[in-house]
């Protein structure tokens, strides 16, 4: 009995000693872990403080957010016109690119003449004695996007009004024809008046010196009529040969423009001016060595 009791007490002592050693070990390791956690927490806090100090310079550039384009007008940020921007799609983490619609005015402009532009041009013509400046104003003809080879009718009518005031003509019928387009509200009546005097306008245009204001006004009137009425078909057939064979380069270009306009809309010209006749005039230009003039004709 005494021997068994001693063995029992020995086993109990070993168990108590092992438990005490384990407790001491856990207390030591736990203190080290807590110190490491505290150090990591302090490092994270320092990082957060540094980010808070840098955020105003990095993330909040309000000028860039309000104006997402460069000084030259080029868009450099996501969501620019004609580009794409990332939007989160529902139900998932992935982002999808969505097209951005083209922005309207002031990002796109139209090349047209307003009433104020015409008034300013008329004032410049009245005050300027320089023939070069006057010619530049009269020859300015914005293109009509719906009819590539025709010119904007309003700009032609404005140039007619300016040419009428600048270059008087002895023929009263020509003056009446140049005055007729002034009343835009009575366009049908104006077309009738122009039709009465169209032959005189063609004769006066051919007889005048090349590149004169009156010749330019007559050609502008004829170009306008190719767009709105077929009255030019017969008159153009009488006009084009003298100017193409004897006129200057500018006159040849101006005569070829209404011909190309008529060929683009054959309903207006009927059978008088068609693709075959236009081809014959192009051949005439090529035979005379005026290829550069032919290349300038479709240009604005």
UniProtKB/Swiss-Prot annotation:
InterPro entries: ARM-rpt_dom, Armcx_regulator. Keywords: Membrane, Mitochondrion, Mitochondrion outer membrane, Signal-anchor, Transmembrane, Transmembrane helix. One of its GO terms (cellular component) is mitochondrial outer membrane. It is found in: Mitochondrion; Mitochondrion outer membrane. Residues 35-54, 69-99 are annotated as: Disordered. Signal peptide: none annotated. It is a single-pass membrane protein. Residues 28-300 are cytoplasmic. It holds the Pfam family Arm_2. Residues 1-6 are mitochondrial intermembrane. The chain crosses the membrane at residues 7-27. Disulfide bonds: none annotated. Residues 1-6, 26-36 are annotated as: Mitochondrion outer membrane (MOM)-targeting sequence. Belongs to the eutherian X-chromosome-specific Armcx family. May regulate the dynamics and distribution of mitochondria in neural cells. This is Protein ARMCX6.
């Amino acid at each position: 009995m005494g021997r068994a009791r001693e063995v029992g007490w020995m086993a109990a002592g070993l168990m108590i000693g092992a438990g005490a050693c384990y407790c001491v070990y856990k207390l030591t390791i736990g203190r080290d872990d807590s110190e490491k956690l505290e150090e990591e927490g302090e490092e994270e806090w320092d990082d957060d403080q540094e980010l808070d100090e840098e955020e105003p310079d990095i993330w909040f550039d309000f000028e860039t957010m309000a104006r997402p384009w460069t000084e030259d007008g080029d868009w450099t940020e996501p969501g620019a016109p004609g580009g794409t921007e990332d939007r989160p799609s529902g139900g998932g983490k992935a982002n999808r690119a969505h097209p951005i619609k083209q922005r309207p005015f002031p990002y796109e402009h139209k090349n047209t003449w307003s009433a104020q532009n015409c008034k300013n041009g008329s004032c410049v013509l009245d005050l300027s004695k320089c023939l070069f400046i006057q010619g530049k104003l009269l020859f300015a003809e914005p293109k009509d996007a719906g009819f590539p080879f025709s010119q904007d009718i309003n700009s032609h009518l404005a140039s007619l009004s300016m040419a009428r005031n600048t270059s008087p003509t002895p023929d009263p019928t020509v003056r009446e024809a140049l005055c007729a387009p002034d009343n835009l509200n009575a366009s049908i009546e104006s077309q009738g008046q122009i039709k009465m005097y169209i032959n005189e306008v063609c004769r006066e245009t051919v007889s005048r010196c090349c590149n004169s204001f009156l010749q330019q006004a007559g050609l502008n009137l004829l170009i306008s009529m190719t767009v709105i009425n077929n009255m030019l078909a017969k008159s153009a057939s009488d006009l084009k040969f003298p100017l193409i064979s004897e006129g200057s380069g500018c006159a040849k270009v101006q005569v070829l423009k209404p011909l190309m306009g008529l060929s683009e809309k054959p309903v207006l010209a009927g059978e008088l001016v068609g693709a075959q006749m236009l081809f014959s005039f192009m051949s005439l230009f090529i035979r005379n060595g005026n290829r550069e003039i032919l290349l300038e004709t479709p240009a604005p």
